[in-house]
């Protein structure tokens, strides 16, 4: 997912950008900060909706919803397991597991059911060899590497630029962030399709 950086780093970044000896990176700063703001807004909206629909109870848990949807789609080689964290739900095609967060796995709310069904939607995509899922899976290692490096590279780049050094390190950091941002847009068809499959089943 797109990484949200520390507010202090954002503040320092803006101040440095204003005093930097070059103006050639202005557009990159705008794109970077705009993308980070957008990702924060999307994340906040998602958490708000999840919290709202978590208050509406149903007779089954997220785990039961996931298991029943797998059964109805004749998928027998995928396991439903619990994973630590909040909204850390995902489908892992490598070991064929639907990983439901603690707030979904044992919860009997509409929100939990929707999230569980969405993740099983990815399992159905995998079982049916949905091509966009294959592309996303192939890009995951690259995106994970970019996500791990982007913070430190951006910080080093900012420091070097403030000291009058070459901006290429900062450019590299912005490029790494662009990779994670592009990944989010590339995988939109996968997410929309998984949601459509979940809604159809529900």
Regions found by a protein language model. Give the residues of each.
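Core segments of transmembrane alpha-helices
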Residues: 145-155
